Amino acid sequence: MEKYHGLEKIGEGTYGVVYKAQNSDGESFALKKIRLEKEDEGIPSTAIREISILKELRHSNIVKLYDVIHAKKRLILVFEHLDQDLKKLIDVCDGGLESVTAKSFLLQLLNGIAYCHEHRVLHRDLKPQNLLINREGELKIADFGLARAFGIPARRYTHEVVTLWYRAPDILMGSKKYSTPIDIWSVGCIFAEMVNGRPLFPGVSDTDQLMRIFKILGTPNSQNWPDVFKLPKYDPNFPVYEPLPWETFIKGLDDTGIDLLSKMLKLDPNQRITAKQAIEHPYFKETS
């Protein structure tokens, strides 16, 4: 820690406190102090393993992890620092981002996700707050792999409930099979939010979250999701909703954009488009 000075608290994240600090050359970094739930046991070996993988990730759309400081009962992760996140940007852009901006950010997000999925790393907690943006319009994914290293928490350490808005229906219904489609669902939710200027599924509980999804995309059945009945929290008595036309809840997106979004937000995880396939979608071939 002696390398860094001028610590300034800039946030309270899902896994601990985030500080901005400088090194002796005056460069800025983001320091994440990870709180450990079972402090007497020290740092879980899974966390150490995952973080060593994160250090190997090198991509222009992923926040770089420079250093890991292993103190007694805590871990300090030293990341590159960016001033802005996508949530703040959406909040100040009333009615959604300009289409060319949304398209640029979506493509950068998919490029970063595709790279990680190729390296068998899942994010598992994608949301606009975890997407950082610099003044050049570059988007970088933060907190990659931390959800896997420390477990997806039901609550933040500050007792604030972690947002469910970007969580896939398969996870909400108790699926333990974490694979790449859970990140793609989150990307779809973020895409819709960039376009609409507000969250697509702002649920307040697991059940409310599912109902909001079903009311828009329709209730899953054996035709559109053959394995849905196997999920632990699937209820055969779920209310039956028909899917709404996309243009009724997505504004300002052309047909190719809606086609891409619909492929990301498939109820059945096995039917969701991959990040690599999404990058090749005609939506990115058009000029906005």
From Swiss-Prot:
Catalytic activity of the protein? L-seryl-[protein] + ATP = O-phospho-L-seryl-[protein] + ADP + H(+); L-threonyl-[protein] + ATP = O-phospho-L-threonyl-[protein] + ADP + H(+); [DNA-directed RNA polymerase] + ATP = phospho-[DNA-directed RNA polymerase] + ADP + H(+)
Instruction: Report residues binding ATP.
Output: I10, G11, E12, G13, T14, Y15, G16, V17, V18, K32
The record's section on Gene3D superfamilies has: Phosphorylase Kinase, domain 1, Transferase(Phosphotransferase) domain 1
Q: Does the keyword Ion transport feature in the UniProt annotation?
A: no
Q: Which UniProt keywords apply?
A: ATP-binding, Cell cycle, Cell division, Cytoplasm, Kinase, Magnesium, Metal-binding, Mitosis, Nucleotide-binding, Phosphoprotein, Serine/threonine-protein kinase, Transferase
Cofactor(s) needed, names only, are: Mg(2+)
Source species, domain of life: Eukaryota
Q: Which residues form the Protein kinase domain?
A: 4-284
Positions carrying Phosphotyrosine: Y15
Q: What GO molecular function annotation could you give as one example from this UniProt entry?
A: ATP binding
EC numbers, comma separated? 2.7.11.22, 2.7.11.23
Phosphoprotein found in the keyword field: yes
Alphabetical list of InterPro entries matching this protein:
CDK (IPR050108), Kinase-like_dom_sf (IPR011009), Prot_kinase_dom (IPR000719), Protein_kinase_ATP_BS (IPR017441), Ser/Thr_kinase_AS (IPR008271)
Q: Which GO terms describe its cellular component?
A: cytoplasm; nucleus
GO BP term (any one): cell division
Q: Where in the cell is it found?
A: Cytoplasm
| Record family assignment | Belongs to the protein kinase superfamily. CMGC Ser/Thr protein kinase family. CDC2/CDKX subfamily.
Quaternary state and interactors: May form a complex composed of at least the catalytic subunit CRK2 and a cyclin.
What is this protein's function?
Serine/threonine-protein kinase. Involved in the control of the cell cycle. Required for entry into S-phase and mitosis. Probable component of the kinase complex that phosphorylates the repetitive C-terminus of RNA polymerase II.
Q: What is this protein called?
A: Cyclin-dependent kinase 2 homolog
Organism the protein comes from: Plasmodium chabaudi chabaudi
Lineage runs: Eukaryota, Sar, Alveolata, Apicomplexa, Aconoidasida
This protein's gene is called CRK2
